[in-house]
Swiss-Prot record:
Gene behind the chain: rpl3
Keywords: Ribonucleoprotein, Ribosomal protein, RNA-binding, rRNA-binding
UniProt superkingdom: Archaea
InterPro entries: L3_arc_euk, Ribosomal_L3_dom_3_arc_sf, Ribosomal_uL3, Ribosomal_uL3_arc, Transl_B-barrel_sf
PANTHER family in UniProt: 60S RIBOSOMAL PROTEIN L3-RELATED, LARGE RIBOSOMAL SUBUNIT PROTEIN UL3
Entry keyword annotation includes Ribosomal protein: yes
Record-linked HAMAP family: Ribosomal_uL3_A (MF_01325_A)
Organism (species): Methanoregula boonei (strain DSM 21154 / JCM 14090 / 6A8)
GO cellular component term of the entry, any: cytosolic large ribosomal subunit
Stated name of the protein: Large ribosomal subunit protein uL3
Region (Disordered): 1-29
UniProt function note: One of the primary rRNA binding proteins, it binds directly near the 3'-end of the 23S rRNA, where it nucleates assembly of the 50S subunit.
Subunit structure: Part of the 50S ribosomal subunit. Forms a cluster with proteins L14 and L24e.
Length: 337
């Protein structure tokens, strides 16, 4: 007799599968960091994919020490600017923002995203932080940093993307001193992570709109003979007679894609400053020419071209060893086909 049971089609881990609230991904957790204070994140914009030839430095690999072809993703990473510091406190109900210390003066480009505060008193904000620090109420410090898409030609927008980036390392006083020194200044990816290290990549996936249960959940097509009097691409049943409602686990049609996803332990193969050296003739498909710094990531990442990509140091690197990759060749062949 054949097996009469099987695992359910599709994962319930990401339910409800609805559209992301914002194109800017949000982190709820950050990696642990010891040592000098540092920022734990950065952001860029997805360009496209190509391939490189590099020496396989993975220990015990069948091709160890030999040249292999590796698919890579390129992200354009113009410098970000720190607009403000946000100080958090914790109580029995969780984490709450205590105060914000904004840079003076603010960049005019930032007014496209937020309304610049009028009659802002930075002295009062600093005093509120000092009093909270003396009382032992300060729990975490974050930097409010924003991208500069106006410096890019591949992304047709000028509105900066504003996001929180955690400051870690040392005690709270050292974190504040480090972050305060960054107010109004530009930061680079090389200040956050090094070449050869592993990072977590977070983005909003490609949106596919409303899709049926077959494509959305992977349910089996009804047999041709059984679908003569009805439909072929739908579930065979919506559930039992009791309870008298359709349960949320039943695979049904609905929104597919445009959801936040994180891929862990993606290796940083190269961080370059001259985008022209990696741009193919005619530019990247659906993107164009890279005019700023860029980073080469091993493998694929979520989202279409032009999508905002957030990068943080790997939160669970495990046994991965950080080595400087030996790249022999980067393909700049046109992707036009």
């Amino acid at each position: 007799m054949p097996k009469i049971n099987r695992p359910r089609r599709g994962s319930l881990a990401f339910s409800p599968r609805k559209r992301a609230q914002s194109p800017i991904p949000k982190y709820k957790s950050w990696p642990e960091h010891s040592g000098a204070p540092a920022l734990l994140g950065f952001a860029g914009y997805k360009v496209g994919m190509t391939h490189v030839l590099m020496v396989d430095d993975h220990k015990d690999s069948p091709t160890e020490g030999k040249e292999i072809m590796v698919p890579v993703t390129i992200i354009e990473i113009p410098t970000m600017k720190v607009a403000a510091l946000r100080v958090y406190t914790k109580d029995t109900y969780g984490k709450h923002a205590l105060t914000e210390i904004w840079a003076e003066p603010l960049d005019s480009q930032l007014s496209r995203r937020v309304t610049s505060p009028k009659n802002y008193d930075s002295t009062a904000a600093k005093k509120k932080y000092s009093d909270a620090l003396a009382a032992g109420l300060v729990a975490e410090i974050y930097a409010l940093a924003y991208t500069q898409p106006a410096t890019m030609s591949g992304v047709p927008k000028k509105v900066p993307d504003l996001m929180e980036i955690k400051v870690a390392g040392g005690d709270i006083a050292k974190q504040y001193e480090y972050a305060f020194g960054l107010l109004g200044k530009e930061i680079r990816l090389s200040n956050v992570i090094e070449t050869g290290a592993y990072a977590d990549i977070t983005a909003i996936t490609i949106g596919k709109g409303t899709q049926g249960p077959v494509k959305r959940w992977g349910v089996t097509l009804r047999k041709r003979k059984h679908s003569v009097g009805g439909k072929e691409r739908h579930v065979g049943t919506l559930g039992p007679w009791n309870p008298h409602h359709v349960r949320w686990e039943v695979p049904q049609s609905g929104q597919m894609g445009y959801q936040q996803r994180t891929e862990f332990n993606k290796r940083i193969l190269k961080i370059g400053e001259n985008g022209a050296e990696i741009t193919p003739a005619g530019g990247f498909l659906n993107y164009g020419v890279i005019r700023n710094a860029y980073v080469v990531i091993k493998g694929s990442i979520p989202g279409p071209a032009k999508r905002l990509i957030r990068i943080r140091p790997a939160i669970r690197q495990g046994e991965h060893v950080v080595r400087s990759p030996a790249i022999q060749f980067v393909s700049v062949q046109s992707k036009q086909g």
